[in-house]
């Protein structure tokens, strides 16, 4: 019969069944009697090592004797079944209870309900009567877990090659488990190779949502190079790279690709004849073959922009057969890429199995976008809108919004086939993870879509969204002046305010007179992309300041036209901070504010709810992984509706409360179904945040930590421990802290330069992702004082 998604749905995730409670469904051995009564019940509350049984008044059910429990079989996750031979029953009325027990049956936990009763029908020989009963009545223990978040590339061991790899990941899993932590959260591990330069270090710009980045290969897990000289040279290079404080992306990847090619030449033919390789190829060939062809053509043509390739500008399905046949010349071109992905898949699956054996949940990350020049777009372009760019509106991370450059998704096409691309993506991820974070879950409600001619995110609009007609705009009391409100607002006083003594230079070089009051940008600089190209080779700070001023001129509008219907409009995000808004009369400002607040916070709520419910249920149900979401930023009211309905864990940061009426969140108010953290990869670490704004820190110190006097600077280790302990005791199911924040508790271990621990600066789209732990994990694990400190904090918080 129909069951709604239960409140305890998380207990059915592989995170809990496979990693925490270690449940393995058993084969049901049917009772051999001629008349069978089958009892079926769900019992997700059972803990690791507990089993379910049934006791009852009938002789066949033990006559309430705890030594005569009828054991039940877990035939699927959290669902138990018992078959009773009806010929042994004393009557047709059954009275019973379910009991939880461990191996010693004298340690019983009885159901807290009244006795269950069932009245059996008349049964004929050979019949089976099945009863699917209400969930077992045991108290639901809200299990709370602690964990660490760290990118794989940031891991460091004595065996690393200048970057973290899947061997280092196993070492980190061991360390996490040794401190009583149960979760290890990673950043995306997908291949991002576009230019073979450091700009490929951005882990969210994947070229394939299926392929793994070759930089994560554990070279020590591969066969040894037979050539002694090559082996010695490789070890020398590895040691040099590993001595670096930060990742040298280009040197590391050149070294790893070269090493993998040597191993491929030495071992590839033999390894690719194994049954293990053949099974891998069969499982993955749908995406693997085009990925390998794409990678070969990218390197052959010297560019990832397939529109510039002399041929193969679109994936040709007719070539699949030849590319998959070892006897063809085409196969030889791509075999290396098959081999590398086989190696990476095997190593990552080994790390996954190692984590499960250690009771650690590996939590992955689903990037919201893909690179517009990547394999996914090349292979299945129908799923992507290439006439826009995905990003995010302005927030605490970036005053101009974020422009990720990714194409937006063509959900019309994706929904036509039931989101098969997404299902394949999630199912592939389940090979390696038991939980995942949906990056920018708001994008499944509506994405911030920016014109391709924009650099900043300010000229974007939510897509889809209910745009406004002229009549609707005027219904708020604002007389709609289309030309004035949709063109950049450039006047003499604006130029003087922005450019000061350089205002005349700007007028002469970059502007044309539009009318008596206003100017317009010259055609050669009338978009931000044109301005960007004009200043492409400029490094002088004064000229870059001028460039940024030109960007700001172009985005100074009150409304933007809808991307699909230019006769309707969207209010420009953060327009209240610009000169066009300043120029309005007070009554027009008030009218615009009413319109603005209604549009962004009320008008689209039901519409966006419906959009999300078309997509997210399909994705959430594609696998048994535990689903968490990054729901920060401009969050409409409909987001918690959907997340609650689908039982998705929210993200809670005390420094970014979801309640706009408070400056800091109250940890005690975190919902159970949430992930609590202090900092993310887009934020300063705890130590950086502490010194970033002295006034804010002082308020936090007095009002949240309840301490008197001036806050100490820099953040002392004992106070970092206090802050972490408070987060650990929050109601959140998961408390996952960055490795940098864990290290902040120990002044002898932590990196002296707190600024060097920053992973990403979202305001900089060209940021170099190169943070490495400054300590070897082996040395960290050997520091008994640090391990004991972390273990005790976690244990005392009730997380286990």
Residue ranges and their predicted role:
Residues 1, 45-93, 101-123, 161, ...:
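Aromatic-rich carbohydrate-binding modules that target alpha-glucans
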Residues 2-34, 85-88, 118-800:
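Catalytic cores of glycan-processing enzymes that make or break glycosidic bonds
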Residues 36-42:
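A short, amphipathic beta-strand motif
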């Amino acid at each position: 019969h129909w069951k709604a998604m239960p409140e305890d749905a998380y207990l059915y995730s592989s995170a809990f069944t496979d990693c925490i409670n270690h449940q393995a469904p058993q084969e049901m051995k049917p009772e051999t009697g001629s008349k069978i009564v089958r009892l079926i019940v769900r019992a997700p509350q059972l803990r690791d090592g507990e089993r379910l049984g049934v006791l009852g008044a009938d002789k066949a059910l033990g006559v309430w004797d705890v030594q005569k429990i009828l054991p039940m079989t877990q035939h699927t996750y959290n669902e138990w079944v018992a078959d009773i031979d009806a010929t042994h029953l004393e009557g047709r009325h059954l009275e019973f209870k379910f009991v939880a027990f461990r191996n010693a049956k004298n340690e019983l936990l009885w159901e807290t309900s009244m006795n269950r009763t069932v009245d059996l029908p008349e049964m004929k020989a050979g019949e089976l009567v099945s009863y699917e009963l209400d969930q077992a009545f045991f108290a639901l223990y809200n299990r709370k877990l602690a964990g660490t978040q760290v990118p794989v590339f940031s891991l460091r061991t004595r065996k690393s090659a200048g970057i973290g790899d899947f061997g280092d990941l196993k070492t980190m899993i061991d360390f996490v488990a040794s401190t009583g932590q149960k979760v290890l959260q990673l950043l995306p591990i997908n291949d991002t190779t576009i230019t073979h330069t450091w700009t490929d270090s951005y882990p969210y710009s994947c070229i394939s949502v299926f392929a793994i980045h070759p930089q994560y290969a554990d070279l020590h897990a591969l066969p040894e190079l037979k050539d002694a000289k090559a082996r010695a040279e490789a070890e020398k290079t590895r040691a040099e790279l590993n001595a670096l404080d930060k990742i040298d992306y280009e040197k590391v990847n050149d070294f790893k690709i070269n090493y993998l090619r040597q191993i491929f030449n030495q071992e590839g033919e033999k390894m690719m004849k194994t049954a293990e390789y053949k099974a891998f190829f069969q499982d993955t060939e749908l995406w693997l073959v085009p990925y390998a062809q794409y990678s070969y053509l990218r390197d052959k043509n010297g560019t990832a922009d397939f529109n510039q390739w002399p041929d193969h500008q679109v994936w040709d399905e007719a070539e699949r057969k030849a590319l998959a046949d070892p006897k063809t010349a085409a196969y030889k071109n791509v075999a290396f890429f098959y081999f590398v992905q086989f190696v990476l898949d095997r190593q990552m699956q080994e790390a996954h199995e190692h984590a499960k054996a250690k009771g650690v949940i590996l939590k992955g990350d689903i990037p919201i976008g893909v690179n517009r020049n990547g394999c996914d777009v090349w292979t299945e372009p129908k799923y992507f809108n290439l006439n826009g760019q995905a990003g995010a509106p302005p927030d605490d991370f970036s005053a101009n919004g974020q422009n990720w450059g990714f194409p937006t998704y063509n959900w019309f096409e994706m929904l036509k086939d039931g989101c098969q691309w997404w299902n394949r993506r999630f199912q592939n991820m389940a090979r390696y993870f038991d939980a995942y974070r949906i990056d920018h879950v708001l994008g499944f409600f509506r994405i911030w879509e920016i014109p391709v001619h924009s650099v900043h995110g300010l000229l974007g609009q939510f897509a889809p969204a209910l745009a406004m007609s002229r009549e609707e705009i005027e219904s708020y009391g604002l007389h709609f002046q289309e030309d004035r409100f949709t063109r950049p607002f450039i006047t003499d006083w604006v130029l003087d305010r922005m450019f000061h003594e350089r205002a005349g230079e700007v007028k002469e070089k970059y502007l044309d007179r539009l009318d008596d009051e206003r100017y317009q940008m010259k055609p050669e600089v009338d978009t931000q992309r044109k301005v960007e190209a004009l200043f492409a080779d400029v490094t002088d700070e004064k000229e870059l300041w001028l460039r940024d001023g030109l960007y700001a001129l172009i985005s100074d509008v009150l409304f933007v036209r809808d991307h699909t219907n230019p006769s309707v409009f969207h209010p420009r995000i953060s327009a209240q901070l610009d000169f066009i808004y300043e120029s309005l009369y007070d009554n027009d400002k008030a009218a615009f504010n009413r319109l603005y607040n209604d549009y962004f916070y009320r008008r689209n709520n039901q519409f966006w709810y419906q959009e999300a419910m078309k997509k997210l249920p399909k994705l959430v149900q594609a696998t048994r992984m535990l689903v968490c979401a990054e729901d920060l930023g401009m969050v409409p009211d409909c987001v918690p509706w959907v997340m609650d309905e689908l039982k998705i864990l929210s993200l809670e940061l005390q420094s970014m409360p979801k309640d706009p009426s408070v400056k800091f969140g109250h940890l005690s108010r975190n919902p159970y179904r949430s992930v609590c953290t202090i900092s993310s990869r887009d934020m300063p670490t705890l130590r950086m945040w502490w010194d970033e704004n002295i006034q804010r820190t002082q308020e936090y110190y007095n009002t949240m930590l309840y301490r008197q006097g001036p806050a100490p600077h820099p953040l002392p280790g004992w106070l970092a421990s206090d802050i972490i302990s408070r987060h650990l005791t929050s109601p959140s199911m998961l408390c996952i802290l960055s490795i940098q924040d864990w290290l902040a508790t120990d002044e002898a271990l932590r990196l002296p330069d707190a600024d060097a621990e920053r992973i990403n600066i979202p305001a900089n789209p060209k940021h170099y992702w190169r943070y490495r732990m400054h300590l070897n994990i082996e040395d960290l694990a050997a520091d008994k004082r640090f391990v004991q400190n972390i273990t005790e904090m976690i244990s005392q918080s009730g997380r286990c």
